[in-house]
């Protein structure tokens, strides 16, 4: 079972107060419901491939409203041939949609979120929970990128959803138009964790955070190793260049031509090619020399080698 499926399964087992029940149902019916008329009677079908969500919708309807509700199971005949669960509302459908602020009763639908539904903080959380159950998905935190999104068919609802997430919970949600609708999405791991907490997915939150901590620690270690490797490669490259320059000087004019301070460092570098500048400074006979002091002398040796290669004269008095 995917992380998103486990999260939704957890949410379908939560207890809910009546005011919150209305907010959650409003999101579920608005986003997954369809309306039809037959013989002057309105019917609402709420369709999902998730059995737990279908049971949740059925339970919320039976618990909170006096409506005729049925549950059907059908099998898809194409692609994956999964079961499709349909919660059908017949008697009382019109009054239910009005109470959930989905339908005005004048054959026009309300696509944004009514303030009447989300007066309380708990109801705001419940609406987001219903929206996630109806059209949400979240990446497994072990994958390469963090991503949570909620799909809406209508732009007005998508905009209202994003506003709810940002103005009341400061989630830094963004919106995006897709081919068949719109999404509100989160990309920051901290905000996704906050969202899971807001909608009551506490077990999913704990798993998300556990995986995120391990992943972040692994990434930190990898960055540290990469940094150390880069520094080591840089040090080795510099040492090899220094040795090459010293040997070139030795072959052309001889190391004895160098001033004493440079000659000493040149010989130490040839003898100890794998040590750091700090370690090299501790080997100087006249006393310890700082890393910057050793680096200064080696740069002077590099300059002498470059002038010799270019056929230019070398002023050893300026090389100290």
Curated annotation (Swiss-Prot):
The Gene Ontology biological process terms listed for this entry are: cell division; regulation of sporulation
> Any idea what this protein is called?
Probable cell division protein WhiA
According to the UniProt entry, its GO molecular function terms are: DNA binding
Chain residues forming the annotated DNA-binding region: 276-310
The gene coding this protein: whiA
* Keyword entries, A-Z: Cell cycle, Cell division, DNA-binding
Q: What does this protein do?
A: Involved in cell division and chromosome segregation.
The family database entries (HAMAP family) matched by this protein are listed as: HTH_type_WhiA
Is Cell cycle included in the keywords of this UniProt record?
Answer: yes
Q: Which family does it belong to?
A: Belongs to the WhiA family.
**Pfam families in alphabetical order:** HTH_WhiA (PF02650), LAGLIDADG_WhiA (PF14527), WhiA_N (PF10298)
């Amino acid at each position: 079972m995917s992380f998103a499926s486990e999260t939704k399964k957890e949410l379908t087992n939560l207890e809910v107060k009546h005011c919150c029940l209305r907010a959650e149902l409003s999101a579920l019916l608005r986003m997954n419901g369809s309306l039809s008329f037959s013989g002057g009677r309105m019917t609402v079908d709420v369709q999902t491939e998730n059995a737990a969500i279908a049971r949740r919708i059925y339970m919320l309807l039976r618990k909170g409203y006096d409506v005729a509700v049925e549950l059907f199971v059908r099998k898809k005949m194409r692609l994956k041939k999964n079961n499709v669960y349909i919660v059908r509302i017949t008697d009382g459908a019109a009054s239910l949609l009005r109470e959930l602020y989905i339908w005005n009763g004048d054959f026009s639908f309300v696509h944004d979120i009514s303030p009447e539904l989300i007066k309380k903080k708990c109801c705001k959380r419940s609406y987001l929970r219903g929206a996630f159950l109806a059209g949400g998905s979240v990446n497994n935190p072990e994958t390469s990128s963090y991503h949570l999104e909620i799909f809406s068919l209508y732009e007005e609802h998508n905009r209202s959803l994003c506003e709810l997430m940002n103005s009341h919970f400061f989630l830094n949600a963004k919106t995006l138009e897709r081919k068949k609708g719109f999404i509100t999405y989160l990309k920051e791991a901290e905000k996704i964790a906050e969202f899971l907490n807001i909608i009551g997915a506490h077990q999913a939150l704990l798993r998300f955070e556990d995986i995120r901590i391990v992943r972040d620690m692994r990434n930190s270690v990898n960055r540290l190793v990469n940094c150390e490797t880069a520094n080591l490669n840089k040090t080795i490259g510099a040492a090899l260049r220094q040795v090459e320059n010293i040997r070139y000087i030795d072959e052309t004019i001889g190391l004895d031509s160098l001033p004493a301070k440079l000659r000493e460092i040149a010989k130490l570098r040839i003898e100890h090619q794998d040590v750091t500048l700090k370690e090299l400074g501790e080997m100087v006979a006249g006393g310890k020399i700082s890393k910057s002091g050793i680096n200064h002398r080696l740069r002077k040796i590099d300059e002498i080698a470059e002038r010799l290669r270019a056929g230019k004269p070398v002023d050893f008095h300026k090389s100290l």
